[in-house]
Design a protein with these regions (language model features):
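Patatin-like phospholipase
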Residues: 1-17, 32-193
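Catalytic nucleophile serine of serine hydrolases
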Residues: 21-22
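Hydrolases whose catalytic domains are alpha/beta-hydrolase-1, hotdog thioesterase
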Residues: 27-30
Length: 193
């Protein structure tokens, strides 16, 4: 895709800030970590089959609010997002680089932006699992994939989250850019902008 081609051109920068929404949330950690993850990015996006990410919910669609279960994609992300990657993201965060992923809080009807580098650097014993669940939620279109319970950042109570693109298709907040050495903004969008 675009990132692999950009690397091959020799002009791809190391990004100071990466944000991801929807399927972009699945790509964001690999884009953030840089060209050494291009082969994995290319493999994931050229060999993944529908059966690797979706499983019918059967009668569960009546109570789970989604045609498909999130389990296959969760397992796939569990294979892709390693402890080493979490440690590398944490190191980059400590160096001042930032990784954000957006989800939609379906319970309260609001966008939530997660600081994934901060999570990776938190030393939480469940940081990797929480990281995967946030990625999963951002890529879970309401009605198609069952919502993902995540703790509300303000009170810790679990609420249902889904595709971040529902409320915020692009995550760019001017506050994210403050203090940046150089303010160049690249947007890679799948679909229509």
């Amino acid at each position: 895709g675009v990132l692999v081609g950009w690397t091959k051109s020799g002009s791809r920068p190391i990004f100071d800030l990466v944000s991801g929404v929807s399927t972009g949330a699945l790509q964001a950690p690999l884009a953030f970590l840089g060209p050494r993850y291009d082969a994995l990015l290319e493999e994931v996006y050229t060999t993944t089959r529908t059966a690797d990410i979706f499983k019918g919910n059967g009668i569960g669609v009546l109570v789970k609010a989604g045609l498909h279960k999130a389990d296959p994609l969760r397992r796939r992300l569990d294979d892709i997002i390693t402890d080493r990657m979490i440690a590398e993201i944490a190191d980059a965060h400590r160096e001042g680089r930032r990784l954000y992923i957006a989800t939609t809080d379906l319970t309260n009807g609001r966008a939530v932006t997660w600081d994934m580098g901060r999570l990776a650097a938190s030393d939480r014993p469940d940081a990797r699992r929480a990281f995967i669940e946030i990625m999963l939620a951002s890529a879970a279109p309401p009605g198609l994939v069952e919502p993902i319970p995540l703790p509300d950042p303000t009170n810790g109570i679990a609420v249902l989250h889904g595709d971040g693109g529902v409320m915020r298709p692009i995550v760019v907040d001017p506050a994210m850019l403050r203090g940046a050495r150089k303010q160049t903004l690249w947007v890679i969008a799948n679909g229509h902008v």
